[in-house]
Amino acid sequence: MPVYRLAAEHNAFPPAEGANEDGLVAVGGDLSPQRLLAAYRSGIFPWYSAGEPLLWWSLDPRLVLRPPALHVPRSLKKAIRQGAFRITFDHVFEQVMHQCGAVRAAEGTWITPEMEQAYLRLHQMGFAHSCESWLMDENHRYQLAGGIYGVAIGGAFFGESMFYRQPNASKVALVALVGHLAQQGYSLMDCQMTTQHMLRFGAVEMPRSVFLEDLQQAIAQPIPAGLWQTVSPLI
């Protein structure tokens, strides 16, 4: 299948079903809020390294987590019950995203400064969100221990990346995030590519064609955009 070069003058994407065998749909374009939102609504996401052109992907199969189907491992339930972690939403979005890139810097990261600024704009518009986990240090001050960020459109949440500085910190943030999604009626969390980590939490692979159908129903849900800073965590 051909890979399309995106035109600069409009934000439309070719159909995700036209991706090549690796899942690549298109190259080029920019990271404007309008283009990013159009991509997510089409089941497409950006993923590239510094120095490369912008690359846009739609993988087949697609890994998806239904929020009510979240599986929390027994050992993690114990860590949550101990209550050491404090959970917040959208308090330090920029810091969470930067840390997600920093922990992967040695092996190469797609979270470039350009990407950070693009998603910060989405965050300021109420579409991109973070969930943070904090641990108290020896001076009784809470320090950022882990977090996760992604994009929300209607009843779909697109998980982008997570990081941790302390054991279980990102996992607790994930459980808190998915709990919030379930409470608010979100239909799906797009995990993009298959990992054993997310499979353990109840995510399942689905054909891209099925994912795209489910996605259109999810983004049509009347869940408004907006910051989550006042959300009370369920854990």
UniProtKB/Swiss-Prot annotation:
GO terms for cellular component: cytoplasm. Its EC number is 2.3.2.6. GO terms for biological process: protein catabolic process. The keyword DNA repair does not apply. Keywords: Acyltransferase, Cytoplasm, Transferase. Signal peptide: none annotated. GO terms for molecular function: leucyl-tRNA--protein transferase activity. It catalyses: N-terminal L-lysyl-[protein] + L-leucyl-tRNA(Leu) = N-terminal L-leucyl-L-lysyl-[protein] + tRNA(Leu) + H(+); N-terminal L-arginyl-[protein] + L-leucyl-tRNA(Leu) = N-terminal L-leucyl-L-arginyl-[protein] + tRNA(Leu) + H(+); L-phenylalanyl-tRNA(Phe) + an N-terminal L-alpha-aminoacyl-[protein] = an N-terminal L-phenylalanyl-L-alpha-aminoacyl-[protein] + tRNA(Phe). It is found in: Cytoplasm. It holds the Pfam family Leu_Phe_trans. Coiled coil: none annotated. Belongs to the L/F-transferase family. Functions in the N-end rule pathway of protein degradation where it conjugates Leu, Phe and, less efficiently, Met from aminoacyl-tRNAs to the N-termini of proteins containing an N-terminal arginine or lysine. NCBIfam families: aat (TIGR00667). This is Leucyl/phenylalanyl-tRNA--protein transferase. It comes from Magnetococcus marinus (strain ATCC BAA-1437 / JCM 17883 / MC-1).
